[in-house]
């Protein structure tokens, strides 16, 4: 009797097994021994670029956030070249309002980036544990070589961040290296999990992974999951074909019950950064900012409801 498997059969068997394990995690709601989510629910500062640091913190606190995922990049709330001077001021203003800054979002992709050392060293002095690096692109000429080039840069960046005690969480984003997760996972496997892990985005994972691929990705990242991005999308037919359109949480393709249950079963307690990437109708200026904050509040309440269902409770809530 032959026990040989074709390559297709082998991959199919492994995929089915991974799906089964992930499904078991997702269905095991409320099994996390800690009895609740104790991490920080953060506002990703991108949708409110006109707000100063203190105003940003006040707005976030008013609708129930516990922290800020602060943009330290071009056009962000802290410019990279001014990180040494401005990041401490920004963090001080935010913390004075009672919020935390457990993570920052950067564009840094290499230890050779002039902004890398100033940003990482300053963030470390401020006791910010996590940072999101920038993205690497496939040129679609030789993806194996392109992945290795990105891996070399990422390894160097992680080595630098380790010197300062900063943990890197790589964000899976459609159309970039890491979008299918499997590619960047091969790079992660060679690095110390204490300093390099995943910043997982279910929205992009579902866009890339369809029915079951994203669930396999959830299972794959769980042992070294650092941070989570919360956003949603749906497919929309346009004149030129189907396109992914961002939307409020719960109105799109992400299966939030499955995802949050998997997080709870996996024991995830890191920061969750709520993103607002969809268009918010309304006036310009302050009136528009009010509409954005209202949309964030609605999404945050949805997220909290799912977390209570998956984890049983959210720490600090009564």
Residue locations for each model-derived region?
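Acidic/histidine-rich catalytic cores of soluble enzymes
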Residues: 161-253, 260
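Active-site beta-loop-alpha junctions enriched in small/polar residues
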Residues: 44-48, 71-75, 106-109, 136-138, ...
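Active-site acidic/histidine proton-transfer and metal-coordination neighborhood
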Residues: 9-22, 54-57, 74, 93-100, ...
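C-terminal segment of N-terminal export signals and the immediately downstream linker at the start
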Residues: 24-59
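Conserved, mostly hydrophobic/aromatic
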Residues: 60, 68, 94, 123, ...
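N-terminal twin-arginine translocation
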Residues: 3-9, 19-33
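Hydrophobic faces of well-ordered beta-strands that scaffold small-molecule active sites
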Residues: 39-45, 68-70, 101-106, 131-133, ...
């Amino acid at each position: 009797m032959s026990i040989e498997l074709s390559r297709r059969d082998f991959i199919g068997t492994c995929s089915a097994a991974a799906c089964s394990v992930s499904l078991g995690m997702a269905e095991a709601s409320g099994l996390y021994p800690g009895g609740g989510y104790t991490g920080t629910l953060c506002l990703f500062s991108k949708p409110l670029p006109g707000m100063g640091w203190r105003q940003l913190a006040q707005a976030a606190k008013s609708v129930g956030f516990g922290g800020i995922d602060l943009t330290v990049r071009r056009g962000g709330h802290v410019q990279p070249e001014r990180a040494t001077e401005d990041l401490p001021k920004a963090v001080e203003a935010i913390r004075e309002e009672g919020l935390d800054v457990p993570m920052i979002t950067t564009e840094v992709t290499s230890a050779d980036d002039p902004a890398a050392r100033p940003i990482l060293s300053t963030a470390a002095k401020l006791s910010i544990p996590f940072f999101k690096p920038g993205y690497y692109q496939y040129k679609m000429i030789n993806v194996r070589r392109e992945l290795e080039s990105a891996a070399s840069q990422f390894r160097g960046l992680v080595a630098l961040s380790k010197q300062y005690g900063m943990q890197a969480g790589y964000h899976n984003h459609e159309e970039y290296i890491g979008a299918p997760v499997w590619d960047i996972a091969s790079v992660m496997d060679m690095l110390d999990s204490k300093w390099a892990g995943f910043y997982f985005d279910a929205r992009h994972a579902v866009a890339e992974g369809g029915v079951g691929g994203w669930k396999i990705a959830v299972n794959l990242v769980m042992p070294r999951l650092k941070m989570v991005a919360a956003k949603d999308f749906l497919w929309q037919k346009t004149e030129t074909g189907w396109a992914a359109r961002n939307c409020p949480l719960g109105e799109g393709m992400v299966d939030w019950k499955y995802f949050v249950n998997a997080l709870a079963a996996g024991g995830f307690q890191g920061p969750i950064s709520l993103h607002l990437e969809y268009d918010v109708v309304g006036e310009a200026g302050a009136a528009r900012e009010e509409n954005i904050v209202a949309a964030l509040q609605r999404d945050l309440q949805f997220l909290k409801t799912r977390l209570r269902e998956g984890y049983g409770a959210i720490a600090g809530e009564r």
